[in-house]
A protein has these predicted regions:
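N-terminal leader/signal peptides at the extreme start of proteins
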Residues: 1-17, 22
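Alpha-helical hydrophobic helix detector
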Residues: 22-39, 53
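Residue-level signature of catalytic and energy-coupling elements of molecular machines
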Residues: 18, 81, 105, 130, ...
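N-linked glycosylation sequons
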Residues: 71-74, 94-102, 122-315
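Short amphipathic secondary-structure patches
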Residues: 2, 42-45, 49, 57-114, ...
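Flexible, membrane-facing loop/turn or short amphipathic-helix motifs
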Residues: 114-122
Length: 315
C-alpha cells in the first residue's frame, strides 16, 4: 500500500510535466511565427521605402521633360525608374495650372515572403506613387541682372536654340523721356534693399553667380551707373559662356536714369556664346533655351510662359 500511495501521489506531477511541454511547444511556435512576421514586415517596409524612392525619382525626372511633351516625360520617368530598381511602372498626366503640368508615377513590385510562408503567404505586392509638377516660376533664384523685352522676336515665336542676340543699349527714346541712361541692367536688390546706384563689381557677381534669393515679379530699379566694358562685367560674361543664365523679361519701363523701373513679368533661359561691350552699349550673342530652374511655381496661371520650369514633388 505505501508503494501504491507513492505511485498515485506522483501521477499528477507527471501529467503536469506533459502539459508544460505542450504549452512550451505551442508558445515557441507562436513566438517563432511572430518573430518571422516581424522580420518579413520589416523587409516589406524597407521594400516599400525603396519603391517610394523609385517613384519619387521617376516622377521628378519625368517632370523635367514635361515642357517637351508627355512622351519624353514618360520615357525619362521609365529610364529613371529602371536605374533605381525598376518595377511595373504606370505613368499618367494631369493639370494643376498648365495643361499636363503634372506627372504621376506608380511603381509596383512583388516582394517574397520568408518566414510567413509557414502561414501560406508566398509574396506581397508593394505599391508606391509619386506626383511631380512642372510649373512656371513666379519667383526665381540665381537670376542674372540682364533684361530682355517681351517683344524680342525670338520670344514671339518661341524659337528656342536659334542664334540671336540681346542688345544692351541706352533705352532712351529721344523726346520721350523713356528711361534715359537705362542700359538694360537691373538692380536686383532694389525690392528688398533700395540703395540707389550699384557698381559693376556687384553686377558682375550677379552675372557670374546669380542673385541668391528668390526674386518675385514686379518693378525693379535700373542700374545705369556701371559701364559694360568694366572688367567685372566682361570677366563675368566670359566665365558664363556656354552656360545657362536666367534673364528677367520686362514689359514696360517708366522713369529715367537711376529712377527708371522695369516691370518684370517673367523669366527666360539664355545661353551666351560670345559678347561685345562698350562704355554705353553691348551685345550678348547666344540663344534662348528651355530650362529647369530653382524657384517657386505660379499658382494663378497669370505668369507668362517663356520656357522656364520649376520642378516640385507635390504628392
Amino acid at each position: 500500500m505505501p508503494y501504491l500511495r507513492h505511485a498515485l501521489a506522483g501521477a499528477p506531477f507527471r501529467r503536469s510535466d506533459g502539459q508544460v511541454v505542450v504549452l512550451m511547444s505551442v508558445f515557441m511556435t507562436v513566438l517563432l511565427g511572430a518573430c518571422g512576421l516581424v522580420l518579413d514586415v520589416g523587409s516589406w517596409y524597407r521594400a516599400d521605402r525603396a519603391t517610394q524612392a523609385t517613384a519619387d525619382a521617376a516622377a521628378l525626372a519625368g517632370a523635367q521633360s514635361l515642357i517637351d511633351g508627355t512622351a519624353p516625360a514618360e520615357a525619362l520617368a521609365g529610364e529613371y525608374a529602371d536605374k533605381n530598381g525598376g518595377g511595373d511602372l504606370t505613368v499618367s498626366f494631369g493639370q494643376r495650372v498648365l495643361e499636363n503640368d503634372l506627372i504621376t508615377v506608380t511603381v509596383a513590385r512583388t516582394e517574397p515572403a520568408f518566414f510567413t510562408k509557414l502561414f501560406g503567404i508566398e509574396t506581397v505586392q508593394v505599391n508606391s506613387r509619386a506626383t511631380a509638377r512642372a510649373g512656371v516660376p513666379s519667383r526665381a533664384r540665381y537670376v542674372a541682372p540682364i533684361t530682355v523685352n517681351e517683344q524680342h522676336p525670338m520670344l514671339q515665336c518661341e524659337c528656342f536654340n536659334d542664334p540671336t542676340q540681346v542688345a544692351l543699349i541706352n533705352l532712351h527714346n529721344p523726346g520721350g523721356g523713356d528711361a534715359a541712361g537705362a542700359f538694360g541692367l537691373l538692380n536686383l536688390q532694389s525690392l528688398s534693399n533700395p540703395s540707389g546706384n550699384i557698381g559693376a563689381d556687384l553686377l558682375g557677381q550677379w552675372i557670374r553667380d546669380g542673385y541668391q534669393d528668390a526674386l518675385p515679379l514686379g518693378l525693379y530699379d535700373s542700374a545705369p551707373s556701371a559701364n559694360f566694358n568694366s572688367d567685372y562685367i566682361r570677366n563675368a560674361l566670359r566665365d558664363r559662356i556656354g552656360e545657362e543664365l536666367l534673364f528677367p523679361v520686362y514689359r514696360t519701363i517708366t522713369g529715367s536714369g537711376s529712377g527708371a523701373e522695369y516691370d518684370i513679368i517673367g523669366w527666360v533661359g539664355f545661353v551666351p556664346t560670345s559678347f561685345t561691350t562698350g562704355s554705353s552699349t553691348g551685345t550678348i550673342r547666344g540663344y534662348f533655351t528651355k530650362v529647369v530652374w530653382q524657384g517657386l511655381a505660379d499658382e494663378t496661371g497669370t505668369v507668362p510662359d517663356f520656357g522656364v520650369r520649376v520642378i516640385t514633388l507635390v504628392e
